[in-house]
């Protein structure tokens, strides 16, 4: 079974979000199950030179784009036993950021065409083409509409994964007409047209044989208007081919027993070592080294989606508790400034690191007691899974993947691995934070809760099995 992942980012090459983690980890897990996965992505100038040097030129072809043919170099390399193809074109991919350019519609139209034009030259017979998010959605659409009659392509099945419905790849109609050479028959509401523009994600949803969302709850949510980003009707129409498969984490990267970034490695049976990470974290940030004061942390993009309006509303009330708070992330300036002001107002309790630091993030996960993630919506979420693996108990809102992976602690049965609240309401969140703090001070209960969190399986194992089953069903 041969699978080709078409992605716009992938660890360890480039990363801007969770898509890169999925593209980096899932193929390795599928390989353990006997599924051959190869990955194709753009050869961005942002890829570290060391990784680019590990690739060789496999082939040079021309890619038809509108009225011209564009150069396409196919570079081939290997990382961790997985074969990668990098699509080389400096005009489109020698940029200072992955996305956000005036010509993104053209850049990813080119990449979509390049993926399809490369397939006959890859020394690899593709059984299933698996595209991800808006950037490669048109690969599946173009395959069905323009390439399926070609004997080289007619057997290929398609899967499309929605990582975040909010970002859809909406561009002017000229992109469809001039670059992809699709006619008027595609510019209507049953096809690519979307409020006067063209929507790439819509193409992926319509044309793919199977669609997955990155958690079962998110799969249900996106069929409702509140979460549906104006595509809920389309998703309801195609819900027969829509499924939800929760993401995992790469346990070779996120594992407190082997993590080289943290001060002291530990497992569920050596939690006294976790407390060394807490002291090291307090020391790093200049916080008082209080063992019995819980550290509440957030490692997050500072955006509205992450529920920061709730945090902002009741932050001072949280500060009335005996807690310390650490925020690591960057994003909208209004949230950055708010947390910087709180750090100024509460110098003995609040510390903020604006930006991202991989090593520090690992230390925050290992050294904190509670991890706050009150998202407005969360397709899957990575932070809560990492926190659980490190025995840092998550406080989450019951949405998307948070609802699927965090079971609220039940004092009657002793079951659960975290704390959760249902409504997007600041005082519901505050009540849940206070409840978590209360149990933190009940040491036997807390130790049991931490052990329950750490002994569950958050790896890609179960997810990879589900994807293998999905691929297999397409080939029967």
Curated annotation (Swiss-Prot):
ADP-alpha-D-glucose binds at residue 15. The keyword tRNA-binding does not apply. It catalyses: [(1->4)-alpha-D-glucosyl](n) + ADP-alpha-D-glucose = [(1->4)-alpha-D-glucosyl](n+1) + ADP + H(+). Disulfide bonds: none annotated. It holds the Pfam family Glycos_transf_1. Keywords: Glycogen biosynthesis, Glycosyltransferase, Transferase. Gene3D superfamilies: Glycogen Phosphorylase B (3.40.50.2000). Pathway: Glycan biosynthesis; glycogen biosynthesis. HAMAP family: Glycogen_synth. This is Glycogen synthase. Synthesizes alpha-1,4-glucan chains using ADP-glucose. One of its GO terms (molecular function) is alpha-1,4-glucan glucosyltransferase (ADP-glucose donor) activity. Its EC number is 2.4.1.21. The lineage of its organism: Bacteria, Bacillati, Bacillota, Bacilli, Bacillales. Belongs to the glycosyltransferase 1 family. Bacterial/plant glycogen synthase subfamily. GO terms for biological process: glycogen biosynthetic process.
